[in-house]
Regions:
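Thiol/disulfide oxidoreductase modules built on the thioredoxin-like
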Residues: 111-113, 122-184
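Bacterial N-terminal signal peptides
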Residues: 6-15
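Positively charged n-region of N-terminal signal peptides that target proteins for export
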Residues: 1-5
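Conserved segment of the thioredoxin-like fold in thiol-based oxidoreductases
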Residues: 83-130
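Non-globular targeting/processing and membrane-anchoring segments
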Residues: 20-39, 173-225
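Conserved redox-active cysteine motifs that mediate thiol-disulfide chemistry
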Residues: 63-80
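Hydrophobic beta-strand anchors of alpha/beta hydrolase catalytic cores
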Residues: 60-61, 92, 150
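A short beta-strand-turn-helix
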Residues: 35-59
Length: 225
């Protein structure tokens, strides 16, 4: 009986752990974020970030792994922001990580993503070799894979030359909290505040981002006379 009770308690504990969400607050952090030139997922052409940001008011760079359930939840909101504010000087660019380019293309099609997407790595084995990983260590992101990870850039404040674009900016070490981020975006674009909306996702339960994780199956012990 004690063994069965212990198993029940352990299952409850696992449920709590795996029911966490990975939303995080928008915070200004010191980070030496570097300029980059990566290949486009869609056509393999080079995209340089400094050139991409030029002439815009605000750019969201979102790093993601296509297999990550947490990215599944953020992708529609990132697309919504892009569509809603691109005419106001806002843009989004995704940086794919830890999977094949083919898998990234499929993911973009499935999620109906239309903003620009490049890739830094193509394998999960590259995890600790990426700039994405280095940036997360700098900003205190302790998650296993860090997908999604978001950084906002204000092009008028970026350095015009050199490897480093900025040394201080706003980041989100997790999923975007929709109401907070949209308020931030509107402020940076010089748009009036919208009426307060109920948080659509602040308390929702989502999956933790871990690749190929299979739940442990427990068998009920047989009772013998």
């Amino acid at each position: 009986m004690k063994t069965l009770l212990a198993l029940v308690i352990m299952l409850i504990g696992l449920t709590v752990v795996f029911a966490q969400n990975e939303q995080a607050p928008l915070q200004e952090k010191e980070i030496k974020y570097k300029d980059w030139t990566y290949k486009s997922v869609r056509d393999d052409k080079d995209i340089n970030l400094r050139k991409f940001a030029k002439g815009k008011k605000l750019v969201l760079v979102v790093y993601f792994a296509p297999w990550c359930p947490n990215w599944k939840h953020e992708a529609p909101f990132a697309q919504k922001l892009y569509e809603k504010y691109k005419a106001n000087g806002f843009d989004v660019i995704g940086v794919g990580e830890y999977d094949t380019v083919a898998a990234m293309k499929t993911n973009l099609d499935d999620k109906k993503i239309t903003f620009s997407v490049v890739y830094e790595s193509e394998s999960r084995d590259s995890k600790q070799k990426t700039l994405h990983y280095d940036y997360r260590q700098t900003t205190g992101d302790t998650r296993g894979w860090g997908s999604p990870w978001n950084i906002f850039l204000e092009p008028t404040k970026l350095k015009k030359k050199g490897d480093t674009l900025t040394e201080k900016t706003f980041v989100v070490n997790g999923e975007l909290i929709e109401t907070d981020v949209e308020k931030f975006v509107r402020e940076k674009l010089g748009l009036p505040a919208e009426e307060n909306k109920a948080a659509t996702s602040a308390n929702k339960t989502i999956e933790i981002c871990e690749p190929e994780t299979k739940p442990t199956t427990f068998k009920k012990p047989e009772l013998r006379d």
